[in-house]
């Protein structure tokens, strides 16, 4: 049964989560009710659950949208004195605008130039217009014979045609030009002469040729057996009574058998084989020292 209390501090009961208890209700689960205040039943708090974080990429909850993450950077260091700017120390002409210089027109007074003397020009009587052929009329062709030109000395600096040494085109001499066909005449080959002694010519049996089965497909080989022996005469063949099948124990289980050896003398010594060195303190069995 539940217990009633008039404590002003609300307490959580052990009723199922999600049920709200009002004033005047007393459940049978051990609920503690405050006087005049409704409380929730006892249950686990928010800090009991360990849910994956939604911030960042490490151990991030893949079923949720990632929350915004920010990084705090340390304060940048102050710039050294040599990197500081000079500040507003530049002089800008106020008359210079983005359209050009804006100022009133100014004029300059120069000195008087030197006077030039009268030029020497021909007068009207120096011309003869009647001697000038009409410019607008067609005139017949006119030719002029000049004097004989002086003969130029012979230029001997240029080489003669036979002074050039061009590479021949016979054979593959110049790789950029097609070569002319060239032929080579070889001398007559001497006839083959037999050796002085015909016995010095090696015969077919003197060549050491490997077995053809080592580097080619093996040839079929056959073996001929010898003549079989004549069967044993009937009088030498053992009969059924010559065999003793009851004495054969190879294919049967048999009792263990032991052999008794001879008695050895106690004074007789046996040759012991070479044994590895034994550690210190090790004693042979049967000996006291």
Curated annotation (Swiss-Prot):
Basic residues composition bias: residue spans: 280-289
One Pfam family in the UniProt entry: SHIPPO-rpt
Region feature Disordered, mapped onto this chain: 108-136, 181-211, 265-289
CC per GO annotation: cytoplasmic microtubule; cytoskeleton
STPGR repeat residue intervals: 122-148, 202-227, 238-263
Key words of the record: Repeat
Sequence similarity: Belongs to the CIMAP family.
Protein name, UniProt field: Protein CIMAP1D
Originating organism: Homo sapiens
Gene: CIMAP1D
């Amino acid at each position: 049964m539940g217990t009633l209390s008039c404590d002003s501090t609300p307490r959580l009961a052990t009723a199922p989560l999600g049920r709200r208890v009002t004033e005047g209700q007393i459940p049978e689960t051990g609920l503690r009710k405050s006087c005049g205040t409704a409380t929730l039943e006892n249950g686990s708090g928010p800090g009991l659950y360990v849910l994956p974080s939604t911030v960042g990429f490490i151990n991030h909850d893949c079923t949720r949208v990632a929350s915004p993450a920010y990084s705090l950077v340390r304060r940048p260091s102050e710039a050294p004195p040599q990197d500081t700017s000079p500040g507003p120390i530049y002089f800008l002409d106020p008359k210079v605008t983005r359209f050009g210089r804006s100022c009133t027109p100014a004029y300059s007074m120069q000195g008087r130039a030197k006077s030039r003397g009268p030029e020497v020009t021909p007068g009207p009587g120096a011309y003869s217009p009647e001697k000038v052929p009409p410019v607008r009329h067609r005139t017949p062709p006119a030719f002029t014979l000049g004097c004989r030109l002086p003969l130029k000395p012979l230029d001997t600096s240029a080489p003669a045609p036979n002074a050039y040494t061009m590479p021949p085109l016979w054979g593959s001499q110049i790789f950029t030009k097609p070569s002319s066909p060239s032929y080579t005449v070889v001398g007559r080959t001497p006839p083959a002469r037999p050796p002085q002694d015909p016995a010095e010519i090696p015969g077919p049996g003197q060549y050491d040729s490997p077995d053809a089965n080592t580097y080619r497909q093996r040839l079929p080989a056959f073996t001929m057996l010898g003549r079989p022996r004549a069967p044993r005469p009937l009088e030498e063949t053992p009969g059924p009574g010559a065999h003793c099948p009851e004495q054969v124990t190879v294919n049967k289980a048999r009792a263990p058998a032991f052999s008794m050896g001879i008695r050895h003398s106690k004074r007789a010594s046996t040759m012991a084989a070479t044994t590895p060195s034994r550690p210190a303190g090790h004693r042979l069995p049967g000996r006291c020292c």
